[in-house]
Amino acid sequence: MNYQLIPVNLKKKVKKEDGKTEYVNYAEEIPQDPEMEKLLKSYQDKGDALLSQKVGKLNGKLEGDRTIIRFEQTNLGHLIAEAQRQKAKADIGIMNSGGIRDSIQEGDVTYKDILKIHPFGNIVSYFELTGKELLDYLNVVALKEVDSGAYAQYSGISMTVNRADKKVKNVKIQGKPLDLNKTYRISLPSYNAAGGDGYPVMTKNPTFVNTGFIDADVLKEFFEKNSPINAEKYIPHNEVIFK
C-alpha cells in the first residue's frame, strides 16, 4: 500500500482575471478542531516552559557561526570540547565543527539556546591511545579541510599542523610534550568515533566507551556549574597553529 503525505489546508497560487495573484486552498478547507487544539496546547505550553528554562548567564558572545567555526578555532568550539573532555575525564577533547550549529549571544542562556547548538542528540564517547597512536590519529583528524564539518575544535592540546607535510608537530598534552609511550584518553562525539566526517573508526578500539551522555545535556550541565561564563576565557590563543 502506498501512502502520500498531504499538508492540511495546502494553498496554491493562482492568477485572477485582473492579473493579480492570490493563494487559494487546493481542496475544501478543514476547520480547526477546538477540542484537539486545546489538548495539544497543553503539551506545547509544557514544551515552551522547558525550552525557556534558564541554564546560565554568558558575558560576551560564543562564536558558532558555520562561516567561522568551520575555518578557525573559536571560543565556543573550545568550550564545548572542554565540557566534553571534563565529562569524560579525558586528557584531550575533540569536537567536530559540524556538530556545532549556532552561536550563543550574551545574556541569559536558555535550554533552547543549548538545543540550537546541539540539535542532533550525539553521545559523548571516549577511547584511549598511546602517544604514538595518538600522533597517527591526529595526522588524520587535524588535517581535515576547512569549510567542512570535519574541521575539529580542541581542548587540552596544542600543536602545529603542517598541511604541506601532512603531519602535526610540537604536540603538547595539558602543557606537557607528547610522550609516545604514555596512554591518553580522548573525548569525541560518538558520530565521529563511528567514522563520521571521515574520522578513524574508534568504536572497535577495546578501550572505546559510549558514555550515554547526550551532548546537549553535557553543555547544559557545564553552563549550570560554571555560570556566569566569560566568553573571553575560552578564546583560543594559538594553541593550534596551521601552516
PLM feature spans:
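Active-site-adjacent helix-turn-beta-strand microarchitecture at beta-sheet edges
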Residues: 1-53, 145-153, 160-161, 167-171
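Short amphipathic
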Residues: 4, 56-60, 126-128
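Proline-rich intrinsically disordered, low-complexity coils
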Residues: 7, 31-34, 47, 63, ...
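Feature captures C-terminal
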Residues: 14, 19-23, 78-243
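Hydrophobic alpha-helical scaffolding
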Residues: 26-33, 37, 48, 66-74, ...
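Electropositive phosphate-/nucleotide-binding environments in soluble metabolic enzymes
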Residues: 33-37, 41, 52, 74-78, ...
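Generic structural signal of hydrophobic/aromatic residues within well-ordered alpha-helices
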Residues: 36-47, 51-58, 114, 134, ...
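Glycine-rich phosphate/diphosphate-binding loops and the adjacent beta-loop-alpha structural elements
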Residues: 53-73
